[in-house]
């Protein structure tokens, strides 16, 4: 994109017309115009919730070179009146790796009234890489009144933040009364922390799953496969290919994801 086109988009950001602002933000993201971040930061204060949301989302992509400015500005949205804005601000903070936000995001995980925001918080804490959040994540994991999706994200993030020393505790959790989807996430977390035998257990769950649960497990397997520098999933779960092909045959909608996992683990 040439300089003149960029200037026109930046001018649109300064307009008072939300439609022009939204279109400009999206175009700046598509063109990877990182120098637009300071201009987009101003739109986090827009009276239009859709613009605040779009600006927060954009800064997750474009804010990495202005973290010291963008991070605090995004944190100001953590108490926004709109749950979609709060959720997007949390995710953008994770995208730019703004670790000073960890404590505030932990607070949202336990206290925000929106399950959407709590789910974003649980997921983002795993990406921010601060093990101090594990205790808060465990509280959400074990909270029987918590939304199931939030508990799933908490389990996954514990796997990202933990060490093998956590494995006995996670095994105890796995043997407790938990939703099956949360147990699947715990198996993935334990595998990532070194319990190699647990991937075969996860594949066994997949073999018996209905379509919705199969999709959930396929997402876990895809995530694990994408993280591995040296693929070991197929080695650790000898039945993986057979089960993936059976699932793809049983539920054709899952075929592309099954093939993706096979390609990643080849």
Which functions belong to the PLM regions below?
Residues 32, 59-66, 93, 97, ...:
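Alpha-solenoid repeat junctions
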Residues 16-17, 47-48, 81-82, 113-114, ...:
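Short inter-helical turns and helix N-cap capping residues of alpha-solenoid HEAT/ARM repeat scaffolds
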Residues 179-191, 196-266:
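Long, ordered, amphipathic alpha-helical scaffolds
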Residues 59, 77, 92-93, 108, ...:
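TPR/Sel1-like alpha-solenoid repeat signature
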Residues 1-53, 60-61, 225, 246-266:
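N-terminal alpha-helical scaffold/docking segments in eukaryotic complex subunits
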Residues 1-12, 31-45, 64-79, 98-111, ...:
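Amphipathic alpha-helical scaffolding segments comprising HEAT/armadillo-like alpha-solenoid repeats
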